[in-house]
């Protein structure tokens, strides 16, 4: 997984027109949760290999793109699939939840475990009055 840091607005829009699948992280250097998320993204990049790109966009360097993407809370995460916003999330996401969302974006959701059958017959005795 490549981490692409601070593409221009034109480069970002080009990625959308090329129908790419990637995670866009809108951040600021002065934002505490953004700094925490950057460590999570580095770990995920190491673990997930070359399956998806992470694009980091500094809101202070690309204010027009930030406004166009309607970023009001940072970090702002956009899960892009085939050039379209599949989902978005505002704020910090723990590693496990972020990784699960990326797997879903890639179509690699883990199988859902079937819950054991816990149905029982109910018998009511007596009428009570």
Label the predicted regions.
Residues 26-30, 129:
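Aromatic-flanked redox-active Cys/Sec active sites in thiol-based oxidoreductases
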Residues 1-20, 97:
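N-terminal leader/targeting and pre-domain segments
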Residues 8, 58-60, 92, 128:
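Conserved acidic residues
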Residues 113-128:
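Beta1/beta-strand and adjacent pyrophosphate-binding region of the FAD-binding site
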Residues 72-110:
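Non-catalytic, surface beta->alpha helical segment in thiol-disulfide oxidoreductase systems
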Residues 31-34, 77:
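The canonical Cys-X-X-Cys-His
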Residues 35-49:
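Typically the conserved alpha-helix immediately C-terminal to a functionally engaged Cys/Sec
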Residues 22-26, 41, 54, 64-65, ...:
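A short, hydrophobic beta-strand/beta-hairpin element that forms part of a small beta-sheet core
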